[in-house]
Amino acid sequence: MNYNNFENSKGDGHSRLPKPTYSGTLSDGYDESKIKRQKTDSAFNAAYSPHMYPNSPYYEGSWNTGYTPQLHHVAPHNQYFHPIQPSTQYNYTSPPNYTENYIPPVHQNISYAPALNLQKWPSSYCENTQALKNDKDYQTSISYEDVAIPTVKEIQLIEKNRGKDTFMNEISPVPSSKDQASAEPTEIPRKDPELANSNAEDDHNNLGLEDDDRDEQLESEGLGKVVLVPGTSIALITDEDVKKWREERKKMWLLKISNNKQKHMQEMGIKEDELKSQPSIFKESRKEKQFIQSIQNQVQRGNPKIDLNLKLIQREFANENSQLLDFIRELGDVGLLEYELSQQEKDVLFGSSEDNNKNHYKPNYKNRKPNLSRANFTRNK
C-alpha cells in the first residue's frame, strides 16, 4: 500500500501512518471513533411492504448518533398470510393535539386545573376557642381511679410460749386517687444521706441483737440450733446430739480410716465382725435412693401393648396351676406329703455338690503349654 498520500497535518513533510480502526479496515483519513456500534435491527424486508399493514407502527432502529428516533411502519412476524384483525371492543379517542400513537406533543404548554384557595383563619380564632375538659371530653374505656390494689405483707412472729411459729398477715390496701386527692398534701422533709445511713446501720444492729436474744432464749430452754448433716437426713437438735455425733465420727475414723486400725480396735475392745455388722448410713441412704428410683422407673416406663394371644395362654396356665395346687393341698391334708427325701433322691432331683462344682469350672485358656503353641511346631517330623 502506498502511504505517500497521507500527509501530516503539521506540514513537516513526513508521511502519516494510518490509525487502527474499530472495524478492522484501514480508513482514508476518516475518523471512525464516532461509529462504535453497528445497526442493531435487521434490514428491512421488502416482502412485507408497510402499506399493507398500516396499523402496526414501530420505531425504526437508528444509528447511535444521538438523534431522536423516527417512526417507521415495520410488519412484525408473518402477517402476510394472517393479517391482524382490527380491534372493535375498545376504541379510544385521542385528543386532537395527540399523534397517532397517543404521544403528546413535545413543544406545548399543558394547562393544569387551578389549586383550591383555602380560606386562612385569623390567629384570634385559635385564641378564642374553648379549652377541652379532660373529665368529660376524653375518658378511657376503663377507669382505674377507683381501683385499689391491696398489698399483703407477711410478718413472721415467733411465739416462745409453746415453741411454735405463727404467721400473721397484715393487709394494707393502697388508697384510691379520690382519697389521695381529698387528703391534704403534706410536705415530705428531705433526709440527709448521713442520717439515713446511720438509721440503716442502727436497724441492722437491732436485728442482729434480736437474733442473738432469740438464740440465747432457745439455748436456755434447751433447744439449740438445728444442725443438718450434709448428705444425710440426720438432724442434730440438742447439744447432746452434737456431742454424740462427734464421738461417733471420731470413733469410726479411728476404726476404719486410720492407719492404726488394729491398735485402736484393741484399745476399744471392738472386733472386726462388729464393725462389719454395723450398717453404714451412707450405704443405707444409697439403697433407699436406688429403691425409690427403681419404683419411679417402673411407674414411668410405658406399658407394652396388650397381646390377646399371650393373655389366653396365661389364663390357661393359671387354671392348670390352680388345679395342681388343689391336688397338692388334698395330699397334704391326708398326710401323704410327710416324707423325708434321702440323699440319693435329693441328688437325683436337685443335683449334688460335685455336679454344681463341675458346672462352675472354667478352663484356663491363657496358661497353655509352650509346646502347644504354633511357633514350636516343626514342619518335618
Curated annotation (Swiss-Prot):
A UniProt-annotated Pfam family: NUFIP1
Sequence ranges of Basic residues compositional bias: 359-371
GO cellular component, one term: nucleoplasm
Major location (coarse): nucleus
Residues with N-acetylmethionine modification: 1
Residues with the Phosphoserine modification: 172
Keywords recorded for this protein, A-Z: Acetylation, Nucleus, Phosphoprotein, Ribosome biogenesis
Record's keyword annotation contains Acetylation: yes
One record GO biological process: box C/D snoRNP assembly
Annotated localization: Nucleus
InterPro entries reported in the protein's UniProt record: NUFIP1_cons_dom (IPR019496)
Region span, Disordered: 1-38, 164-216, 350-381
Function: Involved in a late nucleoplasmic step of 60S ribosomal subunit assembly.
Leftover remarks: Present with 259 molecules/cell in log phase SD medium.
Protein's UniProt name: Ribosome assembly 1 protein
Gene, per the UniProt record: RSA1
